[in-house]
Amino acid sequence: MITINKNFKLNSNHYNSKELVKFALKNIEINNIDLIDLSNFILEVFNQEPFILCKTSGSTGEPKVIKLEKTSLLNSVNLTKDYFNLKPGYSAISFLPMNFIAGKMMLVRAMVIGLNLQLNKPTSNPSKFINKNYFFSAMTPMQASNSINKLKYINKLILGGSKVSNSLSSNILSKIDTYYETYGMTETATHIAVKRVSKNDSISTPFKVLNGVSISTDLNNCLVISVPSITKNKIIT
């Protein structure tokens, strides 16, 4: 089961699991449309089932609803925590929708690690909401493109969901020294590989798989991903 770190904050408020469930139930009771997806996910995290249901994006086939074990979410958190050196009390900000895995995992990371998470309504243009320093944020390339002048406030910025174009990369690196491009999918509980992109690199650096992840190609030249800590089955894409 998922245990909340005592340092966890959501929008500047401390919550334990009971308080978070109460918060979610209240939002559903009053039909707070902006928080319904968040609230439903909170209730799912703390129910008695060992899994959550998550909708895939369709990158590995037809979009579908799959089961992800809660232990897999925890293992995914640990991979991210170790790679980006996330610690209790660090600040984070997210504008990702809570009905897909990337948004869900931002909350799970915050709860488990003990981050101070500023969770905002999903928007393609989050620029006006970034007005102070944050240690960690995950964005789509479009969100980053529309927030170019505010990226300096984010220490560790990860971009995923689609490829970062060369022009966008140049624009980002004109404002900050480093960002991280990620590769992953719903079936792997978000990213399993990361590429560090820095203005100081003379050549482009490749993606590197996270600890415990292995990749190969099959006879059809399809990518085969093995992440035993997240899923028992190999993923072919």
Language-model segments: which ranges?
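AMP-binding/adenylate-forming
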Residues: 69-75, 91-146
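Alpha-helix/helix-capping structural signal
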Residues: 71, 142, 162-163, 229
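Conserved pre-ATP/AMP-binding loop-to-beta segment of ANL
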Residues: 37-55, 88-90
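Gly/Ser/Thr-rich phosphate-binding loop
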Residues: 147-201
